[in-house]
Amino acid sequence: MSKTTINLEQNGRIFPSWIMKNFKKFVLPDIIRKEGEDPCNEPVTTDKLTTYQAFIGEYLNYRSPFKDLLVYHGVGAGKTNTMINVYNILYNYTPKWNIFLLIPASLHDDPWLKDINRWMAQDDFDKRFANIIFIHYDSPFADRDFLEKVKKADASKTSLFVIEEAHRFINNVHNNVSSKKGKRAQVIYDYIQQEKKENSNTRIMLL
């Protein structure tokens, strides 16, 4: 097994072992409970990333062969913070990013703007923030807004597409295809798929 990469098509079965070998520092210790203690009642440190959040940042860092990930965590597990940490790490390698943040409109201010202000690195904050392009995929004009913002984005930068509540977005795509009514989500989906095929550096995070 290579220390830097693994071919999942050839060695998919040993992927868990490869992860354990190459990311040892992120292995969680066994939970040892004392009688009468409830780990759910332990105070949570809110100003520090959890081990699993930090792991994802390392797994998707700029030099990683892996560029896409479905962050399949439960509600309240910190998926938003996880994505912001990934962006912090990528930006530290190069500031040339287009972060296309596809979200329901109701999540724009909370959690996204709230967590960006809290978790995004403060150095070069304005430049980091300028790279973030918000698209509300539940807008009646989502496809038009998306294509316009893609067209206006700096083509010399690498794109990272982040889809919040990805299951909801994919359900919209399915409804577009099956009902043959409306194409908002399908247009966005097809564009991202095509860009991914044409540019191997394009990244996708599904939350």
How does the language model describe each region?
Residues 99, 203-206:
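Hydrophobic/aliphatic anchor position in the core parallel beta-sheet
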Residues 197-203:
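A short helix->loop->beta-strand "cap" motif at the edges of active sites that frequently abuts
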